[in-house]
UniProtKB/Swiss-Prot annotation:
HAMAP family: RNApol_bact_RpoC. The lineage of its organism: Bacteria, Pseudomonadati, Pseudomonadota, Gammaproteobacteria, Enterobacterales. GO terms for molecular function: DNA binding; DNA-directed RNA polymerase activity; magnesium ion binding; zinc ion binding. It comes from the Bacteria. This is DNA-directed RNA polymerase subunit beta'. InterPro entries: DNA-dir_RpoC_beta_prime, DNA-dir_RpoC_beta_prime_bact, RNA_pol_asu, RNA_pol_N, RNA_pol_Rpb1_1, RNA_pol_Rpb1_3, RNA_pol_Rpb1_3_sf, RNA_pol_Rpb1_4. Its cofactor is Mg(2+); Zn(2+). It catalyses: RNA(n) + a ribonucleoside 5'-triphosphate = RNA(n+1) + diphosphate. The gene is rpoC. Pfam families: RNA_pol_Rpb1_1, RNA_pol_Rpb1_2, RNA_pol_Rpb1_3, RNA_pol_Rpb1_4, RNA_pol_Rpb1_5. DNA-dependent RNA polymerase catalyzes the transcription of DNA into RNA using the four ribonucleoside triphosphates as substrates. The keyword Cell wall biogenesis/degradation does not apply. The keyword Cell membrane does not apply. It comes from Escherichia coli O6:K15:H31 (strain 536 / UPEC).
Amino acid sequence: MKDLLKFLKAQTKTEEFDAIKIALASPDMIRSWSFGEVKKPETINYRTFKPERDGLFCARIFGPVKDYECLCGKYKRLKHRGVICEKCGVEVTQTKVRRERMGHIELASPTAHIWFLKSLPSRIGLLLDMPLRDIERVLYFESYVVIEGGMTNLERQQILTEEQYLDALEEFGDEFDAKMGAEAIQALLKSMDLEQECEQLREELNETNSETKRKKLTKRIKLLEAFVQSGNKPEWMILTVLPVLPPDLRPLVPLDGGRFATSDLNDLYRRVINRNNRLKRLLDLAAPDIIVRNEKRMLQEAVDALLDNGRRGRAITGSNKRPLKSLADMIKGKQGRFRQNLLGKRVDYSGRSVITVGPYLRLHQCGLPKKMALELFKPFIYGKLELRGLATTIKAAKKMVEREEAVVWDILDEVIREHPVLLNRAPTLHRLGIQAFEPVLIEGKAIQLHPLVCAAYNADFDGDQMAVHVPLTLEAQLEARALMMSTNNILSPANGEPIIVPSQDVVLGLYYMTRDCVNAKGEGMVLTGPKEAERLYRSGLASLHARVKVRITEYEKDANGELVAKTSLKDTTVGRAILWMIVPKGLPYSIVNQALGKKAISKMLNTCYRILGLKPTVIFADQIMYTGFAYAARSGASVGIDDMVIPEKKHEIISEAEAEVAEIQEQFQSGLVTAGERYNKVIDIWAAANDRVSKAMMDNLQTETVINRDGQEEKQVSFNSIYMMADSGARGSAAQIRQLAGMRGLMAKPDGSIIETPITANFREGLNVLQYFISTHGARKGLADTALKTANSGYLTRRLVDVAQDLVVTEDDRGTHEGIMMTPVIEGGDVKEPLRDRVLGRVTAEDVLKPGTADILVPRNTLLHEQWCDLLEENSVDAVKVRSVVSCDTDFGVCAHCYGRDLARGHIINKGEAIGVIAAQSIGEPGTQLTMRTFHIGGAASRAAAESSIQVKNKGSIKLSNVKSVVNSSGKLVITSRNTELKLIDEFGRTKESYKVPYGAVLAKGDGEQVAGGETVANWDPHTMPVITEVSGFVRFTDMIDGQTITRQTDELTGLSSLVVLDSAERTAGGKDLRPALKIVDAQGNDVLIPGTDMPAQYFLPGKAIVQLEDGVQISSGDTLARIPQESGGTKDITGGLPRVADLFEARRPKEPAILAEISGIVSFGKETKGKRRLVITPVDGSDPYEEMIPKWRQLNVFEGERVERGDVISDGPEAPHDILRLRGVHAVTRYIVNEVQDVYRLQGVKINDKHIEVIVRQMLRKATIVNAGSSDFLEGEQVEYSRVKIANRELEANGKVGATYSRDLLGITKASLATESFISAASFQETTRVLTEAAVAGKRDELRGLKENVIVGRLIPAGTGYAYHQDRMRRRAAGEAPAAPQVTAEDASASLAELLNAGLGGSDNE
């Protein structure tokens, strides 16, 4: 018996492995896997249902059909195991060997493997350096290929048609060797000398100069080297033996009625075997060449179909006209092996049901129906029943449970106590979509859910369903309790704010409770404390809203963390005093002494968590909920039609608007305004009228007039139910109330244009048929949009998770000094995001100094928590350099200091945290809230876009950065630099506003001057770009010849004449090469130099420039010499919402990107070509100039002779992230992507921490291109993993050699996922065939570093609680110990969990 157990145990243990290698299989290898050759296409005998011998299901090859029983029945039972029956030849063993034993087919003629032939780029084609078409013609027997030229004039690999071959045969006889079919290709591959070829190509690479040739050569060298290094032989890409999949993986199941259901693979295999056998017979008979050839072609096609059906030609179809599923189809796509079975599996011990509210539950509980619990916990109940001796056997226990005896329910109670269950609601968009709860048994059939976790699940009770899972092992229960319990997930991992926040009823209840009311019952009383307040309210002697004085005892934490009591009399209301009873000790009374809206409640919970920690917060949240529900019920707030008060003014506002519209209509008919202007004006009028109506309505709802105690009238905030719901943030918004009681306003047509007659009615008045019809479009579009949005958002999340899945925190501190400069986000006149929000929870990269001094305010490597941020604000610091994931130097993963605070826990992040996945979920989860549309700018919006001045909002002093300016004749500053920024600094030195100032703007105030709020500080003409002189003197025209380069135009209205420079297209032949310019000379006619340089002041004029000066006029610096009209860019669509985020992460180039200067230097224009001009930048140090062709229609921001810095904008447009990376570096591109993504989310009011976006950017910057290989093994121009280059360079520099130089690459997230080092991860993402083909040829090893690879091969992931296991494995391997038995005991699990949890508190000491 013992050895039997040993035998069974030995069967279950799997090998431990560190990596997975994929390579080409040699024919011998295939034969070594095989247990026999499949010779017949038969499958099962349809009468006996026994497999046919030598067929596709043969028991002799693949193993017995029944456990421990041979086919003929001679040997049965376990005692014969291992015997091979002499009659039927079947080995007596378990039947599961039919899942692992393979067979093979000896092919009568070699066959090309379609993956290496047709998967682009074709590996066979690249290796032989032959075009794919030629190879195909050879393989499918259309032409011959020369294998050995011999002494003839035929080249090796030359393609010959049938006629050419016959001619050559006549001419040379058997001097040469030419064949067709796969044999020919096989012969060519066999005769290749890879190493010699490699040498030859490297020599060629050094000699050649052409870019395309280099690219092609590098590709071939890489492929050849891969073959040499991996030990793959090229001829193995041609199959001579075909492996046969084990039969249980391609089952054949008899249905009732004598028919069979079968896997498509069986059909495909049968085809191959049939054709192969026919070919063998033809060869034995020495049939005519043409017949054999045809049969060989058919065999090739059959094998192609088996490997990848439909890749070449038409797909082979089955009986029902649908293409058969080949081996390639089995693994790729959503239904393939990777995504269907390896990355997502179905789980046992689970149930699902509808959810309902459980308002009486505690936060860590959920209500579980008894029926469900009984079913889910069955094994536990059986065990307990046996343990108690209530049932003798499992069978008896089963009977008891089925009969539902009374004792079973008692046992169930015991089993369930302290055994958490997991609740999951699909779609699980972030990690809070699965949380653990303690079950409470309930009657009924619906799961009860705690109302506060609804926000995290995004659940409501209109029929949502949820799934329950039972964690079985002790470790699983421990993890569920310690990490996944709902009470441990109070903060959202996306932004670190509480996610357990009351909403709807609870908010309304608390708001109602904390409102005050003039002259309420009991006003003016003085009470001894909250208890008395409650007594008075309960006995009906005082109203909840009465303004009273109450004695309140507050507790405050002192320096030692002790609570100190402080009692005082507070002006407050009865309701607030009652609410104070549930507030935990340690919070100030001011927290509840206000009308509590949703924001205030959220802030209250956040403060509680930061001051008092987790436990009090959880208890407080529960109390808030119970109280809120109770008082919401007491309030009796409900919606009646009379609550929607329509303002009296509405009628007159609308009639005024109608009168204005009629007036504009008259103007249009008399031809004073164009149709477009009329339309825009009408829409503006109605939009304004709508705003006026809604303002009147809100004013009306907001306040009511009441009589106070002294009998005077007094205004107070209204108790209108609808208004209270909106004001508290419980439900609804001003915009929705406007539709109920104001007017519905303007509607859009299906094409997106606005209908100029608005819906003047509201929902209380009701809509007429036309109005109803107009509004149906918007409603329907909303629904269609939502459906599209969900799919797109899900796909974005999938790509993000895929690119970031292997990023894990792997060490505590790498000691990087690099970092990102953080400044507040300021757009125009308002601070969109203050500095504290951006740096909270980050680690400083260098000491932060007190502004204006050398005192250190915050030392380097400090985790900035709330108190530090307060300190920064007090000292008005407006820039802090913080560590960032993008600049972290850790090789694989990142260090904890570069990441900073774990947002969901509030302390520095632990090692082993999967920050990549968290980042992906945080960005993807709000994706469904983003809009899908692109904004068409037209009408009112476009006119506001052309700004012409800067008006500041606050008072303060002006600060100009990177500015060049001159003073004009009237003493004002004129800006002559391109990217000038104007900031407004308040008296504390904080930046309040920030504006871009264009070239040629005239400043009213200089740098450092004080301004008052509302003052205009800069003006410019938005429609023309001036040319400003920087020196004083006399104007001298050069090359300005009337009729050739310029033409005179006279303005009809003013009679002034001006010169217009002709575009080179409009000039005569003689004027083509002339360069019209204005030169500034002094009184003696000598050139005036530009100050600070030795360049004469000469201003070249582009085409269309307008000059309003005459030759020889005197001018002074800062004057306008010429004006260049700016064509406004027309109406450009702005991509917004989800598509914009996807574009940023995919790093797509915009349609017309900004042109940036590649190097620093002086701009000049070279010879023009048709439609393009040549921009030349000459560096000051005299190195090679840089040239670029720019289309004529691009508006340039620079003049000839101007100096530009590398990365400056030469022509406006959206900037391409690749250019930013190349010219301004990693930090600039990070800043760009983070800010752009945040802009989209900020518009929708979604808060996401910058960290998450930086994590994705780090993954987009994973690759680098080698510029110069140095002494390394890399090829020039090769794209390699950035960490590999860093490691290689470190080793080279340690040995005193020259490292490789490289440039960082920015890849889109899809590209980056496919370019990962792990082929398993890439194959399970997209383009499975291509990835696997590439990996096999290169003989890639997958080191199983990421999470996805480990999930696929079925072991613990190297993150979270699995991190310790992997670290332990690494340590053991380094020490050379035997790998430990994989089973982890319960004690180990609890110990490692404790260690993980403590690491967060005190930091673990075992490194």
